[in-house]
Amino acid sequence: MNIAHIGLVGYGEVGKIFSAGLRVQPGVASVAAWDLKLADPAHRAALQKHAGQAGVVAVDAMQALCARCDCIISAVTASNTLAVAQEAAQHIRPGTVFLDLNSASPGTKQQAAALIEARGAHYVEAGVMTSVPPYGIRVPMLLGGAQAAALAAVLTGWGMDAQPVSEQLGVASAIKMCRSIMIKGLEALVIESYTTARHYGVEDHVLPTLAETFPSIDW
């Protein structure tokens, strides 16, 4: 698998981080981006300025992005996952890789894949396993789909942490979803416990008991 021209759908925090990180990788000739805000006069100038300074080509439509790129990366909100796939499917070229980074359900990813693969393109789902900003493009990712292993080989060659887990779509997303339930649940419990302990003035008494029960955690 050869990838020379990369396109980001979504030029928010994740899109900007991936654009900057991928643009300098060996073999990457160009990085472009499309975001709905580029069609909004209130936001267009600022996004175009940022993209220009970052060496990213800001295009004016999904069609233009698909026409120039052999790898499309979807980095939007979970609620827009399917809408992006629907629009991309109207313009994507056969053989293009479509990497879906969004935190959508396995079922949504499968629906998105059906749209993309019906056009002869290759859909690969990614389960992004933690927050992107501390890691940049090296954020741990699990990949799923028929081309997951081939894409992982390219991404790891760029120093990324991409692990293929299954050719079956939905597996990577399910793993990420189940992990998120646990992690976010634990975070919520810790915050609630700390807040309540501080409210009652017993924080200094609660923390030692937690440290005794869970000695490996720095409470």
Enumerate the language-model features and the residues they cover.
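Anion (oxyanion) recognition and catalysis
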Residues: R23, G52, E117, T156, ...
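NAD(P)+-binding Rossmann beta1-loop-alpha1 motif at the extreme N-terminus of oxidoreductases
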Residues: M1-A67
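Amphipathic alpha-helical hairpins
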Residues: E13-I17, A64, I72, V97, ...
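Rossmann-fold NAD(P) dinucleotide-binding segment
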Residues: M62-Y123
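Glycine- and other small-residue-rich loops at beta-strand/loop junctions that grip anionic moieties
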Residues: Y11, S74-T77, L101-N102, P140, ...
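Conserved beta-strand segments of alpha/beta enzyme cores
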Residues: S30, G55-V57, V97, H122, ...
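Helical "substrate-binding/catalytic lid" subdomain
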Residues: I175-W219
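Rossmann-fold dinucleotide-binding core
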Residues: A104, K109-K184
